Curated annotation (Swiss-Prot):
It comes from Chlorobaculum tepidum (strain ATCC 49652 / DSM 12025 / NBRC 103806 / TLS). The lineage of its organism: Bacteria, Pseudomonadati, Chlorobiota, Chlorobiia, Chlorobiales. Gene3D superfamilies: 3.40.50.10090. Belongs to the uroporphyrinogen-III synthase family. One of its GO terms (molecular function) is uroporphyrinogen-III synthase activity. This is Uroporphyrinogen-III synthase. PANTHER family: UROPORPHYRINOGEN-III SYNTHASE, CHLOROPLASTIC. It catalyses: hydroxymethylbilane = uroporphyrinogen III + H2O. The keyword Lyase applies. The gene is hemD. Keywords: Lyase, Porphyrin biosynthesis. One of its GO terms (biological process) is protoporphyrinogen IX biosynthetic process. It is an enzyme of class 4 (lyase).
Length: 246
């Protein structure tokens, strides 16, 4: 049985482990990021924005938790707003709360999302970007270049956990007991290679990235990426890994 290293946050690892198991793959869970809610922010008046951007399920979760707890009157405004999402899971989480979203980009990344929005829809308008502490600056950069204003609201922190099991993971790699390393964000990749204090892995270990943003981060580290799914979500990621390991 082939074994995949899963670097997702602990609370998000289990569904992916199940998806891998459907293909007869074993998993070793080694979370290299930890997600924590940010305190000290309030839900703004959503009617002042021409549109709202969410790029991860975490951004939806923490924003809606605060909104429903402290500003439930803003839910109808969110439901009536133009809302963009990156990824099927992010979009699906919004739709569960009655929020209609703009068509999803073909590729689940911010670059594809912004390329599908005409400049005339942005110029002179103000937008809200609900983000994590390590979210990339693609959306605010594009909005600014097109003459719009982007208000950024950080609702969760993305931090490096203690990684006590680093030595165990290094041993498993050395002993040939891991066949694939899977990364679902730039920070999972960066933190992993910082933890093992090396950019080198055994040549027969495949490197899998869930999308182009994560793949680019790995390439900047000097790590060759072997697997990218056709669509950037968990089920397709597991399918692509299984195909490569078969």
């Amino acid at each position: 049985m082939k074994t995949v290293l899963v670097t997702r946050p602990k609370h998000q690892a289990e569904p992916f482990v199940r998806e891998l198991a459907q293909y007869g793959l074993d998993s070793v869970v080694f979370p290299t990021i930890e997600i924590r809610p940010v305190t000290g922010w309030s839900v703004p008046d959503l009617t002042r924005f021409a549109g709202i951007f969410f790029t991860s399920p975490n951004s939806v979760q923490f924003f809606l938790e605060r909104l429903l707890e402290e500003s439930p009157d803003e839910l109808p405004n969110l439901q009536q707003a133009r809302v963009w999402a990156v990824g099927k899971t992010t979009g699906g989480d919004l739709e569960k709360h009655g929020v209609s979203i703009e068509p999803l980009p073909k590729s689940a990344d911010a670059v594809s999302l912004m390329s599908g929005i005409d400049a005339s829809e942005i110029e002179g308008k103000t937008f809200l970007f609900v983000r994590g502490s390590l979210s990339l600056g693609t959306i605010p950069e594009v909005i600014a270049k097109r003459g719009g204003i982007c208000v950024e609201l950080t609702v969760y922190d993305n931090i490096q956990p203690s990684l006590e099991e680093t030595q165990k993971i290094k041993s498993l790699l050395t002993e040939g007991k891991i066949d694939c390393l899977s990364f679902t964000s730039p920070s999972t990749a960066i933190n992993f290679f910082e933890a093992i204090d090396s950019k080198e892995v055994p040549s027969d270990v495949l490197i899998a990235a869930i999308g182009t943003t994560t793949s680019s981060a790995l390439e900047k580290l000097g790590v060759k990426v072997d697997i990218i799914p056709e669509y950037f979500d968990g089920p397709n990621f597991a399918k692509a890994i299984a195909a490569a390991l078969s």
